[in-house]
Amino acid sequence: MATTNSQSHYSYADNMNMYNMYHPHSLPPTYYDNSGSNAYYQNTSNYQGYYPQESYSESCYYYNNQEQVTTQTVPPVQPTTPPPKATKRKAEDDAASIIAAVEERPSTLRALLTNPVKKLKYTPDYFYTTVEQVKKAPAVSTKVTASPAPSYDQEYVTVPTPSASEDVDYLDVYSPQSQTQKLKNGDFATPPPTTPTSLPPLEGISTPPQSPGEKSSSAVSQEINHRIVTAPNGAGDFNWSHIEETLASDCKDSKRTRQTYTRYQTLELEKEFHFNRYITRRRRIDIANALSLSERQIKIWFQNRRMKSKKDRTLDSSPEHCGAGYTAMLPPLEATSTATTGAPSVPVPMYHHHQTTAAYPAYSHSHSHGYGLLNDYPQQQTHQQYDAYPQQYQHQCSYQQHPQDLYHLS
């Protein structure tokens, strides 16, 4: 009985110390209380049971992290809530574990973590291990999963799921607040593959106008198209009011006044048009110097004058207008007769017709052959085919009213 109670004065901790002598981390038996060391062994065993791979990697590469584990007290029954750790340290641990799984050498790992710019050896996870130092993000947003190289779109477009229980860092990184903060600052964990380059709205490149106060409409349309294409947020946020203001200001500046010609300039231009409907460039330059006008103004005046003459011809070609309008302008036949010789009266407009058509030798008709009325019939067709100016209509109407005078021309 004495032998069985002889060990009763020893404490339970001393007995456990005696039994745990051959523990791989046990201490030699002492007279002091070693109950704290036993609790340490239990906590260490529990931690190794939950994180076998990370404990090994931390013992190899991060010795300081072992001291952090000793201060933590992990509850025995909570498998779904791992101990919270610092976000930055957690990202480094994940990167270290992935590279260790790929069988990376410790020297290469330290070189990659300390000097991310210099690439010593190609690895599929090189971008994810060095993006933190290169981007200099305020909050570490590097998330490495078990897959060696996840796609960029998966990391950028993933919808935040707060109910996921992978780890605490996932919630910190992919929370809506952090995403909005990253969108505001413009710092992304991985840049999206198709990021539109937002350019400031550029001013439209417009060519200088030919004359002051004039701007081509093509340049304005190019300016509008250029601003629409280079708008940062598309056509939805495009400032159309600004374009309308610029167009209104351009129209005010480019409003031209109608060119007014003096009576002397108009008279000289009418004289030139009477002889030549189409003028050469040399003649146009001479007229411009004589009338103190620009070459462009003279060209436009002749174009407008030809259009006006064409409209007048279309109105005067009707037989009613021809018979009523130009017969009143003809002089009487008795006034043109010669009183001294008593020769048959010859109408003056017939000779005036040959004088005015002298400038057009191709249109004039030769009367040297005496063929009578048969020779004068093609002349009427010639006048109907080539209509140059109103005098021809005048003579044509005179032929219709006085056919007996054609005999005197032969």
UniProtKB/Swiss-Prot annotation:
GO molecular function terms noted in the UniProt entry: DNA-binding transcription activator activity, RNA polymerase II-specific; DNA-binding transcription factor activity, RNA polymerase II-specific; RNA polymerase II cis-regulatory region sequence-specific DNA binding
UniProt feature, compositional bias: Pro residues: 76-85, 190-199
Keyword terms: Developmental protein, DNA-binding, Homeobox, Nucleus, Pair-rule protein, Phosphoprotein, Transcription, Transcription regulation
DNA-binding feature ranges: 254-313
GO biological process, one term: central nervous system development
Localisation: Nucleus
Mutation effect (P208L): In allele Ual2; half-life is increased
Region spans: Disordered: 71-93, 138-157, 175-221
Main location, first listed in the record: nucleus
Tissue localization of expression: Expressed early in development in a striped pattern at the blastoderm stage. Later expressed in a specific subset of neuronal precursor cells, neurons and glia in the developing CNS. Between 5 and 6 hours of development, found in the midline precursor-2 cells in a segmentally repeating pattern. Expression in many other neuronal precursors follows and reaches a second peak of abundance at 9 hours of development. Expressed in the hindgut between 11-15 hours of development.
Top-level division of the source organism's lineage: Eukaryota
Gene Ontology CC terms, in alphabetical order: nucleus
Keyword Calcium in record: no
PTM comment, free text: Phosphorylated at as many as 16 sites.
Record-linked InterPro entries: Antp_homeobox, FTZ_N, HD, HD_metazoa, Homeobox_CS, Homeodomain-like_sf
Pfam family, one: FTZ
PANTHER family reported for this sequence: HOMEOBOX PROTEIN HOX, HOMEOTIC PROTEIN ANTENNAPEDIA-RELATED
Function of the molecule: May play a role in determining neuronal identity, may be directly involved in specifying identity of individual neurons. Required during embryogenesis for the process of body segmentation. Homeotic protein, required in alternating segment primordia, it specifies the correct number of segments.
Further details from the record: 'Fushi tarazu' means 'segment deficient' in Japanese. Flies lacking ftz exhibit embryos with half the usual number of body segments.
Family, per entry: Belongs to the Antp homeobox family.
Record-given protein name: Segmentation protein fushi tarazu
Species of the source: Drosophila melanogaster (Fruit fly)
